[in-house]
């Protein structure tokens, strides 16, 4: 009996040490305008079973706006955090503005659905690497993208871009026939939308 009790205590300790059991739901569609949107515009959600009011990291993958795939990086999976990996459409199938709109639409989906996965609408952080960093910067700084979905960019808890371009993205410049060595800052550059607030 003592051995069984000791084993139960040890197992409870392991569960407490490693946190709650994580669940994962893959391939939830957030935009279905056409067949291509239906295929590409999906999210994966990793969350702790039974959790409530958790911070949410919405992760956008890199790939130059022309490739890559939705992911939930192991490095950001932490106890107490809901992580949403976002897929989006690529150039040249759609224009860069449409890709940014995909990012905003994904944020709308997170805002409207994250509570059922234990997340909090007041604790949504946007993050991404490379092209993903560019997308989260555009969605957060050019308020018109989220405003289209009745969301206020100022209500985001934070934005954490990794290696995202602050000037107009090279894929947008390429689509206009502008050399990738010629930097421009226009309405498709995050730094164009930097605000004092």
Language model segments and positions:
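Serine-hydrolase catalytic core
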Residues: 183-197
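Alpha/beta-hydrolase active-site loop
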Residues: 94-115, 138
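Sec-dependent N-terminal signal peptides
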Residues: 4-13
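Primarily recognizes the serine-hydrolase "nucleophile elbow" in alpha/beta-hydrolase
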Residues: 111-174, 186
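Short amphipathic alpha-helix adjacent to the substrate-entry channel of hydrolases
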Residues: 69-86
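Short beta-to-alpha linker loops that shape the active-site pocket of alpha/beta-hydrolase fold enzymes
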Residues: 63, 87-94, 165
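N-terminal cap/lid segment of alpha/beta-hydrolase-fold proteins
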Residues: 19-51
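Short beta-strand element of the alpha/beta-hydrolase
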Residues: 53-62
């Amino acid at each position: 009996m003592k051995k069984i009790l000791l084993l139960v205590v040890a197992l409870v300790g392991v569960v407490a040490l490693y946190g709650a059991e994580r669940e994962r739901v893959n391939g939830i569609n957030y935009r279905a305008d056409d067949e291509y949107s239906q295929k590409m515009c999906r999210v994966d959600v990793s969350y702790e079973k039974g959790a409530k009011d958790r911070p949410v990291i919405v992760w956008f993958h890199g790939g130059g706006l022309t490739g890559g795939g939705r992911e939930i990086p192991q490095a950001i999976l932490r106890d107490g955090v809901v992580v949403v990996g976002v897929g989006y459409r690529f150039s040249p199938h759609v224009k860069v503005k449409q890709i940014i709109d995909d990012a905003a639409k994904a944020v709308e989906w997170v805002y409207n659905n994250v509570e059922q996965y234990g997340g909090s609408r007041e604790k949504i952080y946007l993050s991404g690497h490379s092209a993903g960093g560019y997308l989260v910067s555009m969605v957060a700084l050019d308020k018109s993208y989220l405003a289209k979905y009745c969301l206020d960019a100022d209500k985001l808890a934070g934005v954490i871009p990794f290696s995202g371009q602050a000037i107009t993205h090279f894929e947008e410049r390429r689509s206009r026939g502008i050399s990738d060595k010629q930097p421009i800052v226009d309405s498709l550059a995050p730094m164009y939308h930097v605000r004092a607030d």
